């Protein structure tokens, strides 16, 4: 399953302006709620609870906030390129500027984990990350996300 099965073109924010991790999660929750029909506060709370367990920043300027929602019908992805890097409490100390939000139905189990692994592999590829950082509009970002890893490198 390609990453574009998880994220639609309208679920890409090419230059999100935020000043903190909390503000980023709020903005992402608002957009995710708008696109999925979920309650914005419920989405934000799920993301916040997951962050309390440990940061979802995976290093190299990338974060993958994620959570499960009982009323969600299918796995949903949202990608944001931040207009400037922010502190996301990353283990490598690097500020984050690429964020891929992943929401899954409560019973998603292995599918949720597989999606997380695919996203992490894609975004930790330095060539792909470089192309995402250089892309200035949603269509350009979507095109990079649509590339198979070997082609994107």
UniProtKB/Swiss-Prot annotation:
Recorded GO MF terms: kinase activity; protein kinase activator activity; protein-N(PI)-phosphohistidine-sugar phosphotransferase activity
InterPro entries (alphabetical): PTrfase/Anion_transptr (IPR016152), PTS_EIIA_type-2_dom (IPR002178), PTS_Nitro_regul (IPR006320), PTS_SugarTrans_NitroReg (IPR051541)
Domain of life of the source: Bacteria
Domain PTS EIIA type-2: 5-148
Keyword field: Cytoplasm, Kinase, Transferase
Pfam families: PTS_EIIA_2 (PF00359)
GO biological process, one term: phosphoenolpyruvate-dependent sugar phosphotransferase system
CDD domains cross-referenced by the UniProt entry: PTS_IIA_fru
Descriptive protein name: Nitrogen regulatory protein
């Amino acid at each position: 399953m390609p990453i574009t099965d998880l994220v639609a073109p309208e679920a890409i924010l090419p230059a999100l302006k935020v000043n903190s991790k909390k503000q980023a999660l709020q903005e992402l929750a608002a957009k995710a709620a708008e696109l999925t029909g979920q309650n914005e506060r419920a989405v934000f709370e799920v993301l916040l609870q997951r962050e309390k367990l440990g940061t979802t920043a995976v290093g190299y300027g990338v974060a993958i906030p994620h959570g499960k929602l009982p009323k969600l019908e299918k796995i949903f992805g949202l990608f944001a390129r931040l207009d400037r890097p922010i502190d996301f409490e990353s283990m490598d100390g690097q500020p984050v500027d690429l964020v891929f939000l992943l929401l899954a139905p409560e019973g998603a189990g292995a599918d949720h984990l597989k999606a997380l692994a695919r996203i992490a592999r894609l975004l930790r590829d330095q060539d792909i990350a470089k192309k995402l950082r250089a892309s200035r509009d949603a269509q350009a970002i979507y095109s990079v996300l649509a590339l198979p890893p070997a082609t994107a490198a």
